[in-house]
């Protein structure tokens, strides 16, 4: 009989309800939410689930005066109880609305299933889950203006560069190996991968830096689209691997077990390099903060989906990443290296995953009370 990864087998045993997503709907921009609709949705979720999600809080204000909103989900949201912290972000690049939808969809999944799904309840009770659904609101709103029905192709923020040029790529402006070469980013202000005048010159990555350095995140997903891959450091070099490359690969296998994404470094997955990226800074900067295992899920395929998947693809793509998002939250408490035949206490789920192998056979008892 086929052997199942322990976390996946345990997850199926723990899940007791299906997701009816009554708080999820489609936006007015080709099925995607506008910036204002995202703000309204965050307010609505806090109104309906005030005991589980914080009010939106700004981590920075853009050049055009828009807030970069953040919310937390936990059983005591906004309170530092020393629980493992996990971060989910989206829309570094303005033309990638599926990244935002995927994050919001997961938030709704957690809120609607808390108290009825044992896994969701355990994670919300024992994690501090933080969400930044739109990191680049100025670029996002620019696409709303030019293409109100969706399909806008603007990528960068809206920094005036002079001479009629606009925008810096937020995901080339982080401080780790910023501007290492002109292959992984560009010094040309007209380029889509323009890195800016200096590291953290842009409000969006600088706000994220300041926010992250004040917290204790263990892992992070920085959502993008597209390619159906999960990317991890290093991004800045074709041949270098992190000291934690084996662990990254193990994490990658777990995180993609349900959606079958490819996983690896930037070069291994999409065939080019990036410098000044979020993931390299999250992991590589270990002086101002502890290292964070950061990943970039690239949602959607190259053939059908690309930057603006059709409306009938929006929910399937978001749903395909629920398992990865849950697994990321599990990993904040430790890497699974063990086998377990029976779980009788939810707290033992993570404690017991510290010995043995990480497989169970179909038919073995997986009981959670």
Question: Where is each model-derived feature located?
Answer:
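Metallocarboxypeptidase
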Residues: 144-145, 149-342
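Intrinsic-disorder/low-complexity accessory segments
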Residues: 1-34, 302, 314-335, 340-341
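Active-site-adjacent structural elements in enzyme catalytic domains
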Residues: 2-158
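Extracellular/luminal regions of secreted and cell-surface proteins that mediate adhesion/ECM remodeling
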Residues: 315, 330-369
